[in-house]
Amino acid sequence: MQANKNQDELVKTFKAILKEERFGSQSEIVNALQSEGFNNINQSKVSRMLSKFGAVRTRNAKQEMVYCLPAELGVPTAGSPLKNLVLDVDHNQSMIVVRTSPGAAQLIARLLDSIGKPEGILGTIAGDDTIFICPSNIQEVDKTLETVKSLFNYAD
């Protein structure tokens, strides 16, 4: 039972540290956790936790590259709360733009890239909260738009 309590405290502290948006390296996170009393933490454990909680590196308000958590925690899949991270989907004759919660664009772009050409997506470019999607065929941009919207259960 004590191990579960320690694990819960570690996760809580880990998330709180990442919410500070001031740690740019895994070693800085290790040091912060050790200063909070988690002496058995190491870089490989931090690396696994970053992956598990879907942490991404993004620029903070000071324009420093730091680790942070997406708005919804946990490793996302198309059927998980990932759809909650998509705020807007719009398009013109040649491109689709997806606006996301801060820090979530790269994660969502990776998912879109993985479905790729069969679904009409030639490629993506992601910033912190915006994704540009280049359709495979601009004559079928509306079809690709509907595919993207349905993937995230997005309705206008």
Swiss-Prot record:
It comes from the Bacteria. GO terms for cellular component: cytoplasm. Gene3D superfamilies: 3.30.1360.40, Winged helix-like DNA-binding domain superfamily/Winged helix DNA-binding domain (1.10.10.10). It is found in: Cytoplasm. Pathway: Amino-acid biosynthesis; L-arginine biosynthesis [regulation]. Keywords: Amino-acid biosynthesis, Arginine biosynthesis, Cytoplasm, DNA-binding, Repressor, Transcription, Transcription regulation. GO terms for biological process: L-arginine biosynthetic process; protein complex oligomerization; regulation of arginine biosynthetic process. Pfam families: Arg_repressor, Arg_repressor_C. InterPro entries: Arg_repress, Arg_repress_C, Arg_repress_C_sf, Arg_repress_DNA-bd, WH-like_DNA-bd_sf, WH_DNA-bd_sf. GO terms for molecular function: arginine binding; DNA binding; DNA-binding transcription factor activity. Belongs to the ArgR family. PANTHER family: ARGININE REPRESSOR (PTHR34471:SF1). Regulates arginine biosynthesis genes. HAMAP family: Arg_repressor (MF_00173). This is Arginine repressor. It comes from Shewanella loihica (strain ATCC BAA-1088 / PV-4). The lineage of its organism: Bacteria, Pseudomonadati, Pseudomonadota, Gammaproteobacteria, Alteromonadales. The gene is argR.
